[in-house]
């Protein structure tokens, strides 16, 4: 009995000390302290994410330092796996993630329509209106979509600076680029499919340009990492529809990898996140969610993980302001709204895949 009481004292002391250490974020309302205290008592937050663990590492470390006593259980998976896993777990009625964070904006929003908790983050006023859907799904990043190329094997004068220029280059040098252009397999990659939809909306010549890129045979992959690796090695020469955040991070240590920001239009992806209605750790989930959107969390993403910030008040150039100064009106941010769901309707999805297969010769 004495041992049990002693254990209880230790347990309560631990919770109390963690609550004291986990201070109210600057500028937040006083009653947010209740969320902090409850989150510390919950002790854990489970994240389902497409952002790889290495990139998210500094963010996780910063959050756990901000809120001692809350452990982040981070599950890194591709967008299709995340969607299918979450749906299956909901159908089975078992435990699942507290927060979903996905680069596949359309499937993330589809999940949010059925499973997201409505939550007005204290950071809401710092975000662009197009990045928030019904205070349920929030865009968290501002990531241009780029071309990559092998700097050793493609002369600077040949580097394409538009989607049409890319197609013309491959058509004009068909022998050189035969089987050497890579992009997403839109049937295996949720992100790849979503970007193909957005390309088709942004560019009336999309399918014609895609056919030009595919003249010598298009190589398709389901992973950004694989595409960058193959372009860097010379197995492929050009990569199309690559997340600029990953490309910029790799280019810092890979002298073979070049990046081109197209001048005709640059799609901008924003990783979509939401708190789940059935969260087992709802207060810890809110703390994580707000931390990701906060100036501190966004600074970590921008300056340590090389993922551009959705905010405009982050130190350095890796935020909305910095991207706007660099790319101007070419930027086409993808809004977090119902238009993302249009091509998830089975008939429209199949129609687009059929068009893509024809153009890509797949």
Named regions from a protein language model:
Residues 46-60, 73-87, 95-235:
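Extracytoplasmic ligand-binding site segments that recognize negatively charged/polar headgroups
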Residues 271, 276-337:
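Mature extracytoplasmic/periplasmic domains
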């Amino acid at each position: 009995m004495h041992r049990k009481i002693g254990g209880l004292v230790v347990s309560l002391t631990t919770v109390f000390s963690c609550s004291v250490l986990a201070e109210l974020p600057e500028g937040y309302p006083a009653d947010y302290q209740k969320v902090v205290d409850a989150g510390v008592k919950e002790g854990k937050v489970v994240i389902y994410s497409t952002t790889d663990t290495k990139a998210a590492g500094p963010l996780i470390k910063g959050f756990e330092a901000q809120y001692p006593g809350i452990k982040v259980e981070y599950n890194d998976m591709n967008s299709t796996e995340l969607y299918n896993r979450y749906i299956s777990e909901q159908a089975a009625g078992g435990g699942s993630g507290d927060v979903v964070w996905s680069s596949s904006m359309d499937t993330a929003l589809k999940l949010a329509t059925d499973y997201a908790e409505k939550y007005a983050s204290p950071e809401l006023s710092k975000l662009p209106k197009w990045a928030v859907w019904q205070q349920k799904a929030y865009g968290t990043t501002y990531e241009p979509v780029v071309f990559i190329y092998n700097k050793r094997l493609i002369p600077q004068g040949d580097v394409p600076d538009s989607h049409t220029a890319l197609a013309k280059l491959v058509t004009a040098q068909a022998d050189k680029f035969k089987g050497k252009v890579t992009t997403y397999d839109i049937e295996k990659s949720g992100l790849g499919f979503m970007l193909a939809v957005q390309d088709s909306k942004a560019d009336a010549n999309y399918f014609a340009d895609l056919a030009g890129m595919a003249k010598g045979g298009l190589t398709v992959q389901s992973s950004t990492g694989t595409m960058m690796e193959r372009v860097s090695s010379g197995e492929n020469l050009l990569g199309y529809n690559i997340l600029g955040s990953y490309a910029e991070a790799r280019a810092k240590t890979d002298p073979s990898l070049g990046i081109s920001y197209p001048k005709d239009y640059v799609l901008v992806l924003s990783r979509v996140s939401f708190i789940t209605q059935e969260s087992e750790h709802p207060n810890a989930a809110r703390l994580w969610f707000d931390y990701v959107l906060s100036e501190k969390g966004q600074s970590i993403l921008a300056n340590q993980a090389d993922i551009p910030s959705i905010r405009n008040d982050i130190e350095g150039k890796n935020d909305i302001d910095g991207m706007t100064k660099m790319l101007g009106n070419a930027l086409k941010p993808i809004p977090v709204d119902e238009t993302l769901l249009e091509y998830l309707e089975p008939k429209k999805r199949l129609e687009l895949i059929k068009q893509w297969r024809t153009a890509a010769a797949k």
